[in-house]
A protein has these predicted regions:
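Residues that mark the junctions of alpha-helical repeat units in TPR/alpha-solenoid scaffolds
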Residues: 33, 53, 82, 89, ...
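Alpha-helical segment of the N-proximal tetratricopeptide repeat
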Residues: 32-66, 102, 152, 203-214, ...
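Structured C-terminal portions of repeat-based eukaryotic scaffold domains
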Residues: 49, 255-435, 446-449
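"A position-specific structural signal for the A-helix of alpha-solenoid helical repeats
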Residues: 39-40, 88, 95, 138-141, ...
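Flexible helix-coil transition and linker loops at the boundaries of alpha-helical arrays
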Residues: 26, 64-89, 117-137, 166-198, ...
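Residue at a conserved register position within TPR or TPR-like alpha-solenoid repeats
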Residues: 44, 93, 100, 143, ...
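Residue register within tetratricopeptide repeats
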Residues: 51, 107, 153, 157, ...
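Structural motif corresponding to the intra-repeat A-B loop/turn of tetratricopeptide repeats
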Residues: 47, 96, 103, 149, ...
Length: 449
């Protein structure tokens, strides 16, 4: 689930040609190299210079389409050259689509994705296995994005198309390596990355059966099958998508002990990065005792800690992990195979893990109200309960909600959508206030003791 830098626009170069006969000066503009334009667009996108990135990609796509049309009309051009141009254009269209979706233009994004997939219809003509694999991998990426933009069976069809292409891509890359035709670390890395993509695609299918397609007759079996295939591809060094998705399924099946083990294993994959990030906001294991520990002096990540933090899964994924950890903590008492001591230990393991994950999210973005609320829930779920820390985070989330409500009430709330949003804020305020009231009762009990 799931955080700004700038790049200057490119300048057109001018070439001056002087005529010896009349002394006239003719200015001619040399067109920018499209590869350079695309490189600049990539950098702009990576540094969140969205407007410039979209302009550069749009310029590149327009000119690549012109080149493709010329190449189609030129019978001398080779199929390999044409395929390379199509691949380049499809990737540019895909990047444009990503940007448009990110700024709310879902229709434009979907159109660009569709145009890109249409370019890659059919099979690559080249006999080179690497070229064939690149073709299929590019098309798979587009369908994975389309799956995220659509719902129900449309999304399922997109994911299944991507899965088919990724499986073919793996066969091509593996065959090339096994035959000894190619000995290249880049190809080996591409094979590993493609397997990870396939693992993620299976997880996306499973997620569909847990949500949009949950009422399908075969939903549970289809979800289980997809996740078993994902786990076969799971790499202990990669993101724990499959483990977390399986934990979610096991919770829905009331198989709580399995879910507990799965989500803790998933957390162990990201623990180092989460702890490093949580330490930035005073939520490391040794600093989480007091609520005021969040007010610590600025710290900076370095070395292994920085690398671990940079490799963390996205914001939404970690937020979901924290919720699963808290849910498992609340269900430990239902696991009959654990004795009382083990139940307390496992519960606190889940709670502490959730605090570290939420701390990493708070360090990334401290303006998400839900993270403050969930931290309050985590500290109040500990055994023994950390009421002081829980109160600190609940009070901050309450203040943020009240500020949002005040801003909304200052605007126009005549339409149904605004009224619904305001009602949701009121419900959340009530929920947080109830949590604080319960903490007040706990404080009174402690004083009596």
């Amino acid at each position: 689930m799931p955080p700004t830098k700038r790049i200057s626009s490119s300048k057109k170069k001018k070439k001056l040609d002087r005529s010896n006969s009349k002394g006239n000066v003719n200015n001619s503009i040399t067109a920018p190299d499209l590869n350079e334009v695309i490189s600049q667009a990539d950098v702009a996108l990576e540094t969140s210079d969205i407007d410039n990135a979209l302009k550069l990609y749009t310029y590149a796509s327009t000119n690549l389409k012109i080149e493709l049309q010329k190449m189609t009309e030129n019978i001398i051009a080779s199929e390999e050259e044409r395929e390379a141009l199509i691949l380049s254009l499809s990737k540019v269209l895909g990047k444009m689509a990503e940007i448009k979706v990110s700024i709310g233009d879902h229709f434009g994004g979907r159109q660009d994705f569709t145009d890109a997939t249409n370019l890659l219809n059919g099979e690559a003509v080249s006999n080179n296995p690497i070229s064939k694999a690149q073709w299929k991998e590019a098309r798979a990426n587009l369908y994975l994005y389309l799956g995220q933009l659509t719902n129900c069976t449309d999304a399922l069809n997109a994911f299944q198309t991507a899965i088919g292409d990724l499986k073919d891509c793996i066969v091509l890359l593996d065959s090339a390596l096994q035959d000894g035709d190619i000995q290249d670390d880049n190809v080996q890395n591409a094979l590993i990355e493609t397997k990870q993509q396939l693992c993620g695609a299976y997880c996306s299918v499973a997620e569909l059966y847990l949500t949009d397609l949950c009422y399908e007759p075969n939903a549970e079996n289809a979800c289980e099958e997809a996740l078993q295939l994902a786990l076969q591809l799971d790499d202990p060094k990669s993101s724990p998508d499959a483990l977390q998705a399986m934990a979610n399924l096991r919770l829905s099946q009331k198989r709580n002990k399995e879910a507990l083990n799965l989500v803790l294993n998933a957390y162990n994959r990201v623990r180092e990065g989460c702890e490093a990030m949580a330490d930035l906001v005073g939520l490391s294991n040794k600093e989480a005792e007091e609520a005021n520990d969040v007010r610590v002096e600025a710290k900076e990540l370095q070395g292994d800690a920085l690398e671990a933090a940079n490799s963390l899964p996205g914001f939404e994924f970690r937020c979901q992990m924290a919720k699963l950890l808290l849910e498992c903590a609340s269900l430990v008492e239902t696991i009959d195979s654990l004795n009382d001591g083990d139940k307390k230990k496992q519960k606190n393991s889940c709670v502490e893990a959730s605090i570290q994950v939420l701390g990493s999210l708070l360090a990334e973005n401290d303006e998400v109200i839900e993270i403050w609320f969930l931290l309050g829930c985590a500290f109040s779920s500990a055994d023994p309960k950390n009421s002081q820390s829980a109160r600190y985070y609940f009070e901050n989330s309450l203040e943020m909600l009240q500020n949002v409500k005040k801003i909304m009430e200052q605007g126009d709330i005549d339409d149904e959508e605004s009224m619904t949003a305001l009602n949701e804020i009121d419900e959340k305020i009530t929920e947080v206030q109830e949590k604080l009231d319960l903490l007040g009762d706990d404080d009174e009990d402690m004083e009596e003791d």
